[in-house]
Amino acid sequence: KDVVSKLGETVYWAGPMRGAKYTINAQNVGAIYVRYLPNGKGISDTSPKYRVIATYKETNGYDATLAAGNQPNGVSFSKPDGDGVVYYNKNTPTNVYLAYKALPFQIEVFDPSADTALSMANDSNKIQAIK
């Protein structure tokens, strides 16, 4: 929370994971990544086996995410709460994107398990801003 406060940016995550450590990467303008490291291991491992929640500044995040569903192999649908939209590409189902009508962000949920990534993105209580 202290790191996010110093950034002065809105950052989303999937909440705490028991025994995990976290890294925050804000090197790219408009993109902030929260990486989950189970048991604090894997900090130098760049393989795609760790959960990552990315927050992208996107003025039209909702419209862009909805429109992405029209791309080849794209799938988009409204979240159960009615305010958000979820998108993923069938070729990369471990990367799921979500956005809300009233927020200038697109949020990416990456998990090594495609089912977990989709479930997390679709759960209105799971992906939250760090406060």
Where are the regions a protein language model picked out?
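Short, solvent-exposed recognition patches
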Residues: 1-94
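A short, solvent-exposed beta-edge/loop patch
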Residues: 70-131
